[in-house]
Amino acid sequence: MRLHTGEKPYQCLHCDRHFVQVANLRRHLRVHTGERPYACEICPSR
């Protein structure tokens, strides 16, 4: 129900962004950590 109320309780510790779901915060944290969890099947890049 947070989506409709505008409540965003999950805040990034590195910047001022807030998120409705913790999964979205975890995905956003990759911007700061540089983590690339999925490898390309064609080349060695991630």
From Swiss-Prot:
Entry keyword set: Developmental protein, DNA-binding, Gap protein, Metal-binding, Nucleus, Repeat, Zinc, Zinc-finger
Zinc finger (C2H2-type): 1-4, 10-32, 38-46
The keyword Zinc-finger belongs to this UniProt entry's keyword annotation: yes
GO biological process terms held by the UniProt record: segmentation
A molecular function (GO) term: zinc ion binding
GO cellular component: nucleus
Family annotation (InterPro entries): Znf_C2H2_sf, Znf_C2H2_type
Role summary: Krueppel is a gap class segmentation protein.
Entry-linked PANTHER family: KRUEPPEL-LIKE TRANSCRIPTION FACTOR
Descriptive protein name: Protein krueppel
The organism of origin for this protein: Pholcus phalangioides (Longbodied cellar spider)
